[in-house]
């Protein structure tokens, strides 16, 4: 091949000797040139056509090499003309020629003439290269230019500029050689943010990149760097807050020139989240940290160090480190964060200590030094035994800096808890010294002189063998010697002995023959807080070991109340999670269960129900799964244990947070049975109600009408297999539409009330006719026998006023588990009986019998009976009768009302502050004993039956507390049925005080007002009553101003029915300002300080958000008006809203409005429509400026030139940034049905792109279907605008954005619909967008009028499984 090529080309370029001797003196005529060219080309064509396809590239490369081997510019020029003609006549492919020329090793800038001629040829033929080829050539040319040094002779610059001209041609928008989006991507790869382009390119490249700033802006959320989340402990992963773990930058899509602040590390965001209590899971989600992969994260380390420095600064200004003060809470939280992140090796301890030293050096901050050493002691004492001494020695460097005293530091008052902080440095030295001795290290550190008195005090205390609990000496010794077993045994032994009891003394517990070890006073919280994590771990380990040991030996003596309460208190510490709650759920519970230690199992479940706080959702769902397994075991078929298991399960189900439900239940999709009850219809109904509430509050089903393809489907189907049931229409109407549809499709035939009555009569006849006692007992307690026995007992009491001994024996034989079905049937039977009762005397008799069955005979507990009644699915009149029975049971006899009022009066919900809970608990149970084994009936029968069943220990529970989760359900059922509103008010008046003991009263109120928003419209009095009853129940246990605002309490609580209070703008401003100040960490904050470990909410912002939403939903103002008033806080000029802080206010509005029901936030859509229809966007003459400046909120705001369109844009971004994907999924419909017919101008179109563009990334990650619909809508709008405009001024930014959308998000998923639309665009637009369709000859696919009618584009049939990033 090479020989043939050589002969062809050498023939053309050969010259006579005389020509070479006198170059430039001889010239070929143009005709001769042309003849040569034609003959050369003819010979080459013949050769080329004979070549195989595979050899083409090699051939072209040889030609290029041959040309570059020539030294005469004339020859090179001639040969290049040959190549150009070969390309122009279609003989050679232009891409192959260009690539071979530019990739040639011999093309060097030093050969300036070859360089100039080569790029001139490329410029001539590059127009024929396909767009992907042009992209590749651009990349190579840019790299080639980089080889030119910074200084070259000015003589050669002109020649070198030929390369710049090629680049200029490629970047020329009107030439459209490739999508400009490809070009900017290649340029930004070589010249990222902050790197200057090569001098040869001058401003050509930077000007081109600048044309993409509008596209970058379209894809940016306004004020994104100022938006902050509210941290909750739901475990829900939110993509909005993800950051790059190496740089802390936002993960921006595409290599666009975004605004500078978006490229900055988002330290403020991470720092804010780190400052929030219970934020560690969110930090891990944000940075993609996985506990399994121990990866160090230096940026996280830096922020933790900065937080410690901030705490040191705060301590410097605080007068005293008081109990529960801001500074104390901050140090407590810091200690927890530090341990977690260092323990999982996301942060390195020695690096952090050295960094702290560096940042504190020369600052003179020493007031907080003891607290800092306390934080460091936590980690050191717990990990020094497993790590090298050298890792901890930097602490001594910090000591030298912070403890400059030459004299001895005096011993603090050890009666105060903060004395443990003052001793922290001495404790650290003791641990370091102990480690050095154990390692036989030469690094022995003598005790610093300033710590001598502290050290001597500890040594002396250790010699004192009888330690008292009245000061903090025990805590000090535990902290100092936790790594020295000889010395540690004494103080730890003293603690343990206090709570275990001495093994001889006994105290009674509620119920018959139930005794416990006689230690009733738990360790106080401030003592536990004064122990290091290491000491706390030893204590909790000791307790768990003891419990397991007692479970194995099946001890007849119950655990000491002090031990149980102390164990509960220790479980609140997140720092000891592995031995704490994790050990409790994963080891202790299963071990106790295997040992059949039912008393201890009952105790653990009671603890979980009444003493646990902020337990992570996966632990709670794991426990629920354990409980369903437990319920199926024969040994738990015992009245008290069965009741406890069901009550605990009910609490777990109803207490699931709305944002927790989906992440937790999707973990069980392969086996939904594990989290569902195989036999309890009530528990499964409770789960469905929780599911309905959660999907409503999170707007999960918004925009969809079926559960097909969702995580709910298998759960619902499994429930219907286990416990088939129906729902009353008034309950069903409150469900989200897809759930309503599911239950309508899966309707279960109900047994008629008439049949039930007939069956009861039939069984009663049998009962009366049978005489053999054994036969009766066998017959009526048999498995599979109709569950009508309670109905028979009712008949007996109605007719004979008494129940025989056989009745008692049957009840006993039926067993706790089977009896639930009897209660269920009895509930239906009662409704029938009361419905058909003649009233008057007969009705009173019915009421009396029913109350006797609960209170006199103890046949069924009140909470179970009411739960069953509340969960039945009666309609109309029968539903009202059912609720009437509930009201009678709760209020008619004094039994329950007295129990409630006495319990509420005598007790406080703040168990962590009490030392005498056990005494109060026992006196209450003495006055109102729990009777769970039909005791009343056993005493009444003739002859009386002695009770055999010993009680399992009860430490915390009673009928009032057991009733609380049932009361939650009762209130909801009453809300659904309009005619029983008055009865609900009566219940709240008499029993509302119980909410004082609800563990999540505000959340319950929030969920209720949110879920029943439609039910409660125009029922302002009832809303107010509900809020007043629940919030008012806590008035004695909460400081003033903890929840509702003073303005609300003054005006709304006292408003008259006929004259509701309508708040002014200033009210809304103050309410939003309260959340703004809370999130900014203002001190003192708008809300009183509290110990977040025992609070309903994990941190101040979560509390502020929920109480604000409750107050707004409780107003006697329609949701739409409240929503508009919230938007007006920033959209209208408000004197109370500071300009310099406007994005923080928008952030707060976004958080609040998205946490409210749909009518509140949907008003934003109306605002957007009014802006889009405003003259500034519809008339081209109204605004002569640059639209991208008009939409740039930050620039407009800073220059005081803001317009309503930029404000609305920024506010919409803040709202949508905080929205759930369910709320966002209404955007496609909003675009196609509302905005598409309105958008006619370029400004309107750009405004819509600005609005929705930044959220494509979330749609791609969370709901691809919506992304595809939005993609099509964007093209439909473009077609509208194109047809309504004579010329588009901003065609390039529009096209750039559409290319960005294709390559970053939609890929080819919208190709089919989009091709039809592009075919109908005007030529200039069609030319620019031609690479999206890949149609070379674009003919209109449909007549233009068919697509200009504003109808939505056809939907994509399927979502692509993988979206190409580049193509």
Swiss-Prot record:
Compartment annotation: Nucleus
Compositional bias annotation for Polar residues: 1346-1367
InterPro entries: Mediator_Med23
CC per GO annotation: core mediator complex; mediator complex; nucleus; transcription regulator complex; ubiquitin ligase complex
Residues covered by region (Disordered): 1343-1367
GO biological process terms on file: positive regulation of gene expression; positive regulation of T cell extravasation; protein ubiquitination; regulation of DNA-templated transcription; regulation of transcription by RNA polymerase II
Biological function: Component of the Mediator complex, a coactivator involved in the regulated transcription of nearly all RNA polymerase II-dependent genes. Mediator functions as a bridge to convey information from gene-specific regulatory proteins to the basal RNA polymerase II transcription machinery. Mediator is recruited to promoters by direct interactions with regulatory proteins and serves as a scaffold for the assembly of a functional pre-initiation complex with RNA polymerase II and the general transcription factors.
The protein's name: Mediator of RNA polymerase II transcription subunit 23
Organism: Rattus norvegicus (Rat)
């Amino acid at each position: 091949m090479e020989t043939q090529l050589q002969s062809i080309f050498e023939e053309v370029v050969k010259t006579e000797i005389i020509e070479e001797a006198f170059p430039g003196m001889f010239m070929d005529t143009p005709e001769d040139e042309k003849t040569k060219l034609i003959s050369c080309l003819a010979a080459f064509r013949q050769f080329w056509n004979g070549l195989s396809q595979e050899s083409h590239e090699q051939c072209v490369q040889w030609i290029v090499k041959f040309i570059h081997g020539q030294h005469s510019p004339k020859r090179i020029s001639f040969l290049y003309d040959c190549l150009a003609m070969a390309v122009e006549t279609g003989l050679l492919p232009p891409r192959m020629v260009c690539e071979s020329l530019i990739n040639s090793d011999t093309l060097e800038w030093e050969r300036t003439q070859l360089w100039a001629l080569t790029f001139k040829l490329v410029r001539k033929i590059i127009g024929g290269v396909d767009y992907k080829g042009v992209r590749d050539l651009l990349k190579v040319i840019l790299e080639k230019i980089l080889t030119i040094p910074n200084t070259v002779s000015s003589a050669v610059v002109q020649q070198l500029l030929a390369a710049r001209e090629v680049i200029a041609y490629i970047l020329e928008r009107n030439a459209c050689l490739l999508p400009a989006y490809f070009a900017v991507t290649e340029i930004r790869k070589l010249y990222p943010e902050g790197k200057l382009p090569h001098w040869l390119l001058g401003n050509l490249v930077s000007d081109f990149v600048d044309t993409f700033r509008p596209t970058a802006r379209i894809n940016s959320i306004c004020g994104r760097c100022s938006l902050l989340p509210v941290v909750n402990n739901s475990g829900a992963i939110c993509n909005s807050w993800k950051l790059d773990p190496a740089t802390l930058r936002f993960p921006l899509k595409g290599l666009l020139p975004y605004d500078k602040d978006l490229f900055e590390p988002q330290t403020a965001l991470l720092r804010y989240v780190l400052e929030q209590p219970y934020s560690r899971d969110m930090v891990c989600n944000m940075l993609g940290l996985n506990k399994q992969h121990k990866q160090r994260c230096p940026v996280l380390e830096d922020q933790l160090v900065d937080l410690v420095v901030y705490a040191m600064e705060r301590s410097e200004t605080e007068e005293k480190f008081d109990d529960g003060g801001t500074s104390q809470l901050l140090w407590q939280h810091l200690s927890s964060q530090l341990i977690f992140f260092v323990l999982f090796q996301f942060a390195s301890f020695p690096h952090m200590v050295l960094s702290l030293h560096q940042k504190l050096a020369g600052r003179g901050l020493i007031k907080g030094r003891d607290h800092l050493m306390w934080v460091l002691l936590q980690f050191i004492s717990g990990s020094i035994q497993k790590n090298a001494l050298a890792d901890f020695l930097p602490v001594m460097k910090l000591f030298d800096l912070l403890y400059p005293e030459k004299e001895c530091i005096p011993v603090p008052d050890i009666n105060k808890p903060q004395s443990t902080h003052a001793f922290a440095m001495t404790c650290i030295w003791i641990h370091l010294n102990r480690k050095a001795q154990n390692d036989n290290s030469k690094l022995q550190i003598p005790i610093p002189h300033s710590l001598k008195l502290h050290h001597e005090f500890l040594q002396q205390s250790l010699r004192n063998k009888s330690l008292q609990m009245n000061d903090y000496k025990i805590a000090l010794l535990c902290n100092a010697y936790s790594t020295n077993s000889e010395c540690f045994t004494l103080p730890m032994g003293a603690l343990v002995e206090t709570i275990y009891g001495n093994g001889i003394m006994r105290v009674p517990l509620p119920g018959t023959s139930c005794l416990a070890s006689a230690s009733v006073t738990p360790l106080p919280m401030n003592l536990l807080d004064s122990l290091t994590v290491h000491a706390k771990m030893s204590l909790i380990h000791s307790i768990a070991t003891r419990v397991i040991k007692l479970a194995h030996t099946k001890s007849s003596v119950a655990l000491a109340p002090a031990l149980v309460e102390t164990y509960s208190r220790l479980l609140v510490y997140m720092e000891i999670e592995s031995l704490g709650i994790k050990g409790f759920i994963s080891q202790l519970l299963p071990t106790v269960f295997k040992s059949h230690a039912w008393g201890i199992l009952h105790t653990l479940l009671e603890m979980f129900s009444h003493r646990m706080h902020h337990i992570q959702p996966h632990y709670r769902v794991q426990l629920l799964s354990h409980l369903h397994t437990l319920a199926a075991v024969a040994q738990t078929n015992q009245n008290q244990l069965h009741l406890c298991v069901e009550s605990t399960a009910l609490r777990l189900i109803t207490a699931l947070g709305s944002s927790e439900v989906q992440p937790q239940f999707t973990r069980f999709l392969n086996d939904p049975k594990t989290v569902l009850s195989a036999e309890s219809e009530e528990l499964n109904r409770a789960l469905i109600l929780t599911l309905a509430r959660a999907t409503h509050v999170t707007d999960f089903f918004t925009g969809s009408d079926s559960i097909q393809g969702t995580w709910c489907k298998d759960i619902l189907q499994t429930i219907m297999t286990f416990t088939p049931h129906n729902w009353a229409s008034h309950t069903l109407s409150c469900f989200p539409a897809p759930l309503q549809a599911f239950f309508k499709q899966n309707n279960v035939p109900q047994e008629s009330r008439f049949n039930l009555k007939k069956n009861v009569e039939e069984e009663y006849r049998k009962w009366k006719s049978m005489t053999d006692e054994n036969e009766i007992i066998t017959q009526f307690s048999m498995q599979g026998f109709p569950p009508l026995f309670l109905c028979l007992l009712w008949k007996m009491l109605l007719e004979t006023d008494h129940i025989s001994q056989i009745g008692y024996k049957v009840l006993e034989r039926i067993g706790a588990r089977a009896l639930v079905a009897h209660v269920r049937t009895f509930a239906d039977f009662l409704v029938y009986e009361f419905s058909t009762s003649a009233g008057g005397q007969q009705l009173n008799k019915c009421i009396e019998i029913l109350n006797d069955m609960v209170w006199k005979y103890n046949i069924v507990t009140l909470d179970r009976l009411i739960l069953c009644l509340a969960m039945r699915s009666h309609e109309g009149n029968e539903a009202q009768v059912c609720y009437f029975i509930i009201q009678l049971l709760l209020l008619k006899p004094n039994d329950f009302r007295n129990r409630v009022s006495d319990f509420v009066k005598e007790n406080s919900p703040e168990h962590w502050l009490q030392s005498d809970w056990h005494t109060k608990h026992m006196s209450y149970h003495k006055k109102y004993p729990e009777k769970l084994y039909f005791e009343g009936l056993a005493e009444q029968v003739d002859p009386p039956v002695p009770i055999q069943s010993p009680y399992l220990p009860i430490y915390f529970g009673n009928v009032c507390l057991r009733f609380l989760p049932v009361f939650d359900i009762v209130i909801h059922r009453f809300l659904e049925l309009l005619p029983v509103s008055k009865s609900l008010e009566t219940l709240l008046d008499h029993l509302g005080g119980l909410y004082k003991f609800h563990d999540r009263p505000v959340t319950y109120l929030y969920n209720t007002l949110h879920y029943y928003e439609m039910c409660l419209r125009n029922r302002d009095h009832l809303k107010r009553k509900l809020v007043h009853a629940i919030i008012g129940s806590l008035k004695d246990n909460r400081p003033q101003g903890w929840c509702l605002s003073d303005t609300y309490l003054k005006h709304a609580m006292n408003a008259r029915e006929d004259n509701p209070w309508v708040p002014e703008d200033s009210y809304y401003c103050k309410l939003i300002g309260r959340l703004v100040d809370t999130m900014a960490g203002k001190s003192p904050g708008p809300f009183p300080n509290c110990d977040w470990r025992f609070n309903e909410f994990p941190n101040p912002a979560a509390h502020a958000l929920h109480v604000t939403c409750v107050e707004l939903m409780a107003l006697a103002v329609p949701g739409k008006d409240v929503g508009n008033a919230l938007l007006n806080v920033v959209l209208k000029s408000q004197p109370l809203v500071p300009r310099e802080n406007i994005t923080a206010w928008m952030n707060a509005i976004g958080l609040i409005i998205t946490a409210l029901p749909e009518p509140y936030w949907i008003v934003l859509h109306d605002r957007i429509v009014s802006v889009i229809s405003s003259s500034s966007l519809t008339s081209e003459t109204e605004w002569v400026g640059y639209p991208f400046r008009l939409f740039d909120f930050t620039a407009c705001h800073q220059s005081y030139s803001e317009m309503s369109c930029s404000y609305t844009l920024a506010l919409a971004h803040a709202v949508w940034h905080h929205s759930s994907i369910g709320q966002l999924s209404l955007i496609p419909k909003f675009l196609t049905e509302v905005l598409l017919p309105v958008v006619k101008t370029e400004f309107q179109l750009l405004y819509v792109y600005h609005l929705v563009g930044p959220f494509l990334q979330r749609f791609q990650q969370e709901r691809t279907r919506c992304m595809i619909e939005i993609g099509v809508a964007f093209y439909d709008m473009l077609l509208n605008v194109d047809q309504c405009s004579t010329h588009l001024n901003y065609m390039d930014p529009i096209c750039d954005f559409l290319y960005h959308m294709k390559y970053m998000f939609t890929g080819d998923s919208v190709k089919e619909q989009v091709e039809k639309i592009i075919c109908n665009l005007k030529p200039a637009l069609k030319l620019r967008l031609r690479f999206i369709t890949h149609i070379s000859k674009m003919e209109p696919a449909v007549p233009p009028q068919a697509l200009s009618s504003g109808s939505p584009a056809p939907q994509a049939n399927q979502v692509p499984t993988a979206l190409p990033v580049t193509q």
